[in-house]
Amino acid sequence: MKTLLLTLVVVTIVCLDLGYTLKCNKLVPIASKTCPAGKNLCYKMFMMSDLTVPVKRGCIDVCPKSSLLVKYVCCNTDICN
Protein backbone atom coordinates (compact mmCIF):
# COMPACT_ATOMS: atom_id res chain seq x y z
CA MET A 1 0.00 0.00 0.00
CA LYS A 2 2.84 2.40 0.86
CA THR A 3 4.52 1.60 -2.45
CA LEU A 4 1.37 2.39 -4.39
CA LEU A 5 0.91 5.68 -2.56
CA LEU A 6 4.54 6.65 -3.13
CA THR A 7 4.21 5.80 -6.82
CA LEU A 8 1.12 7.99 -7.15
CA VAL A 9 2.87 10.90 -5.46
CA VAL A 10 5.89 10.61 -7.76
CA VAL A 11 3.71 10.39 -10.87
CA THR A 12 1.73 13.44 -9.75
CA ILE A 13 4.88 15.50 -9.18
CA VAL A 14 6.33 14.51 -12.55
CA CYS A 15 3.12 15.19 -14.47
CA LEU A 16 2.22 18.52 -12.88
CA ASP A 17 3.97 21.78 -13.49
CA LEU A 18 4.76 22.76 -9.90
CA GLY A 19 5.71 26.33 -10.80
CA TYR A 20 3.47 28.69 -12.74
CA THR A 21 4.80 29.41 -16.20
CA LEU A 22 3.60 32.42 -18.15
CA LYS A 23 3.08 32.21 -21.91
CA CYS A 24 3.37 35.32 -24.07
CA ASN A 25 2.89 35.97 -27.77
CA LYS A 26 5.93 36.45 -29.94
CA LEU A 27 5.81 39.10 -32.67
CA VAL A 28 3.43 36.91 -34.65
CA PRO A 29 0.32 36.55 -32.42
CA ILE A 30 -0.32 32.90 -33.29
CA ALA A 31 3.12 31.88 -31.96
CA SER A 32 3.64 31.94 -28.21
CA LYS A 33 6.58 31.12 -25.98
CA THR A 34 6.98 30.14 -22.35
CA CYS A 35 8.66 32.88 -20.36
CA PRO A 36 11.86 32.12 -18.45
CA ALA A 37 11.99 32.41 -14.66
CA GLY A 38 11.80 36.00 -13.46
CA LYS A 39 10.04 37.28 -16.58
CA ASN A 40 6.51 37.53 -15.18
CA LEU A 41 4.97 40.03 -17.61
CA CYS A 42 3.99 39.97 -21.27
CA TYR A 43 4.46 43.15 -23.29
CA LYS A 44 3.63 44.80 -26.59
CA MET A 45 5.70 47.67 -27.93
CA PHE A 46 4.24 50.18 -30.40
CA MET A 47 5.74 53.11 -32.24
CA MET A 48 3.77 56.20 -31.24
CA SER A 49 3.40 57.10 -34.93
CA ASP A 50 1.33 53.91 -35.52
CA LEU A 51 -0.45 52.49 -32.47
CA THR A 52 -2.28 49.84 -34.49
CA VAL A 53 0.65 47.54 -35.30
CA PRO A 54 2.87 46.22 -32.49
CA VAL A 55 6.58 46.32 -33.29
CA LYS A 56 7.67 43.86 -30.62
CA ARG A 57 6.06 41.33 -28.24
CA GLY A 58 7.48 39.00 -25.61
CA CYS A 59 8.31 38.40 -21.96
CA ILE A 60 9.78 40.99 -19.63
CA ASP A 61 10.46 41.39 -15.91
CA VAL A 62 9.52 45.07 -15.47
CA CYS A 63 7.24 47.11 -17.71
CA PRO A 64 9.27 49.94 -19.28
CA LYS A 65 7.93 53.47 -19.27
CA SER A 66 6.54 54.74 -22.55
CA SER A 67 8.33 57.63 -24.22
CA LEU A 68 7.55 60.14 -26.94
CA LEU A 69 8.51 57.57 -29.60
CA VAL A 70 7.54 54.22 -28.06
CA LYS A 71 4.53 52.97 -26.11
CA TYR A 72 4.62 49.79 -23.96
CA VAL A 73 1.55 47.82 -22.90
CA CYS A 74 2.16 45.12 -20.26
CA CYS A 75 -0.05 42.40 -18.77
CA ASN A 76 0.38 39.33 -16.57
CA THR A 77 -1.91 36.58 -17.88
CA ASP A 78 -1.25 33.93 -20.51
CA ILE A 79 -1.16 35.21 -24.08
CA CYS A 80 -2.53 38.62 -23.10
CA ASN A 81 -0.25 40.54 -25.44
From Swiss-Prot:
One of its GO terms (molecular function) is toxin activity. It is found in: Secreted; Target cell membrane. Disulfide bonds join C24-C42, C35-C59, C63-C74, C75-C80. Pfam families: Toxin_cobra-type. Residues 1-21 form the signal peptide. CDD domains: TFP_snake_toxin. Belongs to the three-finger toxin family. Short-chain subfamily. Type IA cytotoxin sub-subfamily. Monomer in solution; Homodimer and oligomer in the presence of negatively charged lipids forming a pore with a size ranging between 20 and 30 Angstroms. This is Cytotoxin 1b.
